[in-house]
Amino acid sequence: MTQPIVRSIPLHVVSNDHPSSSPLQPGVKQSGEDKIGRSPVQFADVPVLRKPSWIRVRIPSGNAVQSLKAKLRENRLVTVCEEAACPNIHECFSHGTATFMILGEVCTRRCSFCDVAHGRPKPPDPEEPISLARTVAEMGLKYVVVTSVDRDDLRDGGAQHFVDCIAAIRQSAPQTRIEILTPDFRGKGRMDRALDILAACPPDVFNHNVETVPALYPNVRPGADYQWSLTLLKRFKAQHPQVPTKSGIMLGLGETLDQVQATLRDLRAHDVDMVTIGQYLQPTSHHHPVLRYWTPDEYKALEEYGMALGFSHVASGPMVRSSYHADHQAKEAGLGFNATVSLGSPAVSSTEHRERHTIASKSASKTESIRHR
């Protein structure tokens, strides 16, 4: 078995002496140092670990990436692939696919792992659901993933906008299966309101990422609550037992194997059907450092452990991300649909399509690694 690359690095909680700035204007982005520098948790003087060979990503040739970006901009859509600096962007874009974000490009949270900008979001764009649905229909997509930034400024956390997008896609592309990757809808009464709204038009797959083990939440997901996320997943499943539920975690933030296994058990105990496990990669030097690169053998062992717990599907590997090959995760988990996708070229079989990805809508949310709230 390949030996893991491990480094124990102390993280420092420091006083926030970052100079105060004027009130944020709607839509103005804080990223990198501007975003993380205002967090009470700082990562000072942390050396960068050398990436192992299994983390390398091949950059494909051709102009497919630029072509898809142009199409997205034409429809005023933004992908999480771009906003969260996903390492799989070239593979996915070169095959004409992406994961769309809705509800803007500015997040109300300051998660230390995520490269999505922080700030004061603009009001939801009422035209976005139609733009998204039109793009999905034009591209002939059979499976889409819709995610968002956290919208703590909205009474329903953005749930109604998710439903509007689901309804618009089903109107324009009725054969398309829809997975939503939601924030946690945390706040007084917000989860209740969000679940009531989603009940009117539930997705085909409901995804919410716990992101990491509970002990690391103060450093990794300030503003979030581990048990709250588990409760959201369980309550949605109880409300919609026929809809597969899904969650994801990142590795390399300082967690132990026992903690990861305990988190997998927690997810299964809260009726989660599918899980993704992938390596965290540091977006910038200001973000949470990578404290360990887990090996391919360890990811394989976690996949086997998860399947033994009763998950219908476990996607575990260094480059696995929450929406990466989401269509095949859903299909292998028993969600029946034709995974063939037409993107203006000859149809691709499900087997050939395994090297492709998925799609969803505007704005920002998830993370450089797995994203997900």
Curated annotation (Swiss-Prot):
Question: SUPFAM superfamilies in the record, alphabetically?
Answer: Radical SAM enzymes (SSF102114)
Pathway(s) this gene product operates in, as recorded in its UniProt entry: Protein modification; protein lipoylation via endogenous pathway; protein N(6)-(lipoyl)lysine from octanoyl-[acyl-carrier-protein]: step 2/2
* Catalysis performed (reactions): [[Fe-S] cluster scaffold protein carrying a second [4Fe-4S](2+) cluster] + N(6)-octanoyl-L-lysyl-[protein] + 2 oxidized [2Fe-2S]-[ferredoxin] + 2 S-adenosyl-L-methionine + 4 H(+) = [[Fe-S] cluster scaffold protein] + N(6)-[(R)-dihydrolipoyl]-L-lysyl-[protein] + 4 Fe(3+) + 2 hydrogen sulfide + 2 5'-deoxyadenosine + 2 L-methionine + 2 reduced [2Fe-2S]-[ferredoxin]
- Can you name a GO cellular component term? cytoplasm
Q: What is its EC number?
A: 2.8.1.8
InterPro entries per the UniProt record, alphabetical: Aldolase_TIM (IPR013785), Elp3/MiaA/NifB-like_rSAM (IPR006638), LIAS_N (IPR031691), Lipoyl_synth (IPR003698), rSAM (IPR007197)
Mark the transmembrane ranges: none
Looking at the record, the residues that make up the Radical SAM core domain are 93-312
Do the record's keywords include RNA-binding?
no
The record's subcellular locations are: Cytoplasm
Cofactor(s) listed in the protein's UniProt record:
[4Fe-4S] cluster
User: What UniProt keywords apply to this chain's record, in alphabetical order?
Assistant: 4Fe-4S, Cytoplasm, Iron, Iron-sulfur, Metal-binding, S-adenosyl-L-methionine, Transferase
Where do the segments described as Disordered lie?
Answer: 12-36, 346-373
Q: How is the cofactor bound?
A: Binds 2 [4Fe-4S] clusters per subunit. One cluster is coordinated with 3 cysteines and an exchangeable S-adenosyl-L-methionine.
Instruction: Give the residues the record marks as binding [4Fe-4S] cluster 2.
Output: C107, C111, C114
**Predominant location:** cytoplasm
**Binding residues for [4Fe-4S] cluster 1:** C81, C86, C92, S323
Molecular function (GO) terms for this protein are: 4 iron, 4 sulfur cluster binding; lipoate synthase activity; metal ion binding
Name the PANTHER family for this protein. LIPOYL SYNTHASE, LIPOYL SYNTHASE, MITOCHONDRIAL
Family per similarity comment: Belongs to the radical SAM superfamily. Lipoyl synthase family.
Name of protein: Lipoyl synthase
What's the gene? lipA
